[in-house]
């Protein structure tokens, strides 16, 4: 049972007499106020006042009834504990400097004499004068040892001060928690002493502000942080929403349109250039014109056409020609065919010179008639026309009548 209950019970006046009656005749424990009052009035003998000035006892208060009930319970517990323990423990030898509370003599409380309110101690029987005595628990210093130590419980050094049950160890600072650990000598408060109580918030360090709701700026959180827009970005956004006035600067010129015009047979310079470029593109494979290098040109196809097929290649610009050279390893584009061949191509494709078809009067001149039609159309290239004429001559030679052989006599004479 809690030691505070025992202290408050033994320290009250007028309770020791009830303890004596409880030792002589135990009664069942009951917390009913009416029953306790009836039993006290019926069983308590009438005592004559010891002094003329002693007043008659008043009615029993509620606190006294609770105290009497607690004393009765203590008496029952004491009897059961004594029967269970070994009686020889009372005669055991205690360590040096130790005291046993059971062998202490009762001493009256200072300033209080024997009177009507005084009662006898727990052991029964008073002093020589018969005055009751009460044990003052506060005067029993050094009788309770520190729990959890290696010493025997209840034994301390003589004259040592009473230490509370959950007192801090030596060297602990004042104001420590109830269950705080001992601090090293000369050291300040430890982490346990600085820990806030249970349920309380820890104090923020100086200068630390809340992230939300405070006056300080919010801290950036990695990828979620967006930098404020610059002046250029703001101007761009305003232009998208509200529009802006810009000056029109034309970028198209006649030179930039060169190569995209129609090949019209006119006396204008632009028409002649477009016609010449169209003819050259057809001779180079018929690729469309493009002034951007690498858009319509395939370096592999150009190399195969130029090296293996021995055909001309047309480049839309000088930059495209250089790009093809850099794209193909160990491939060098020559300056072109011989000067005679270049002049022939220039006269035929650019200047528009061609061989005039000849008029054939007789339909029997088949070869000349075919050459006439080949010169008036672009369906046959010069190489294709040569192949066609060669085959035609073979067929015509096979259809000619053979010459008659010479007579045998003439051969003999010869």
UniProtKB/Swiss-Prot annotation:
- Composition-biased stretches (Low complexity): 45-59, 168-200
Query: Under the cellular component aspect of Gene Ontology, which terms does the record hold?
Result: mitochondrion
Arranged from A to Z, the UniProt key words for this protein are: Mitochondrion
| Chief location bin | mitochondrion
Q: Where is the composition biased (Basic and acidic residues)?
A: 205-224
Q: According to the UniProt entry, which residue ranges have a biased composition of type Polar residues?
A: 20-35
Name where it's found.
Answer: Mitochondrion
Annotated segments matching region Disordered: 20-71, 168-229
Q: Which residues cross the membrane?
A: none
- The domain of life is Eukaryota
What's this chain's function?
A: Component of the mitochondrial ribosome (mitoribosome), a dedicated translation machinery responsible for the synthesis of mitochondrial genome-encoded proteins, including at least some of the essential transmembrane subunits of the mitochondrial respiratory chain. The mitoribosomes are attached to the mitochondrial inner membrane and translation products are cotranslationally integrated into the membrane.
Family membership noted in the UniProt record? Belongs to the mitochondrion-specific ribosomal protein mS46 family.
Oligomer status and interactors: Component of the mitochondrial small ribosomal subunit (mt-SSU). Mature N.crassa 74S mitochondrial ribosomes consist of a small (37S) and a large (54S) subunit. The 37S small subunit contains a 16S ribosomal RNA (16S mt-rRNA) and 32 different proteins. The 54S large subunit contains a 23S rRNA (23S mt-rRNA) and 42 different proteins.
Name of the protein in its database record: Small ribosomal subunit protein mS46
What gene name is given for the protein in this entry?
A: rsm28
């Amino acid at each position: 049972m809690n030691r505070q209950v025992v202290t408050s019970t033994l320290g009250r006046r007028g309770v020791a007499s009830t303890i004596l009656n409880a030792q002589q005749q135990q009664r069942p424990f009951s917390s009913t106020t009416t029953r306790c009052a009836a039993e006290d009035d019926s069983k308590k003998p009438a005592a004559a006042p010891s002094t003329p000035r002693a007043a008659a006892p008043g009615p029993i208060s509620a606190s006294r009834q609770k105290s009497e009930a607690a004393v009765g319970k203590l008496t029952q517990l004491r009897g059961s504990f004594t029967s269970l323990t070994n009686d020889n423990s009372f005669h055991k030898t205690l360590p040096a400097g130790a005291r046993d509370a059971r062998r202490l003599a009762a001493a009256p409380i200072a300033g209080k004499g024997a009177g009507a309110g005084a009662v006898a101690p727990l052991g029964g029987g008073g002093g020589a004068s018969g005055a009751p005595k009460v044990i003052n628990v506060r005067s029993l210093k050094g009788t309770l040892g520190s729990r959890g130590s290696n010493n025997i419980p209840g034994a301390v050094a003589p004259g040592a001060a009473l230490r509370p049950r959950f007192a801090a160890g030596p060297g602990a600072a004042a104001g420590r928690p109830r269950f705080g650990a001992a601090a090293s000598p000369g050291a300040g408060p430890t982490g346990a002493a600085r820990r806030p109580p249970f349920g309380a918030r820890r104090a923020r360090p100086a200068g630390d502000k809340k992230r939300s709701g405070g006056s300080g700026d919010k801290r950036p959180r990695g990828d979620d942080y967006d930098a404020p827009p610059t002046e250029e970005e703001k101007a761009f956004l305003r232009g998208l929403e509200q529009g802006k006035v810009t000056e029109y600067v034309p970028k198209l010129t006649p030179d930039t349109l060169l190569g995209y015009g129609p090949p019209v047979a006119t006396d204008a310079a632009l028409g002649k250039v477009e016609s010449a470029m169209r003819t050259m593109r057809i001779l180079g494979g018929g690729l469309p014109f493009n002034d951007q290098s690498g858009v319509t040109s395939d370096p592999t196809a150009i190399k195969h056409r130029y090296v293996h097929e021995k055909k001309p290649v047309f480049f839309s610009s000088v930059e495209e020609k250089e790009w093809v050279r850099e794209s193909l390893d160990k491939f060098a584009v020559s300056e072109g065919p011989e000067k005679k061949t270049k002049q022939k191509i220039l006269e035929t494709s650019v200047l528009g010179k061609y061989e005039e078809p000849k008029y054939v009067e007789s339909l029997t001149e088949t070869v000349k008639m075919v050459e006439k039609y080949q010169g008036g159309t672009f369906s046959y290239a010069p190489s294709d026309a040569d192949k066609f004429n060669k085959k035609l001559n073979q067929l015509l030679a096979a259809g000619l009548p053979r010459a008659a052989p010479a007579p045998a006599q003439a051969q003999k004479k010869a």
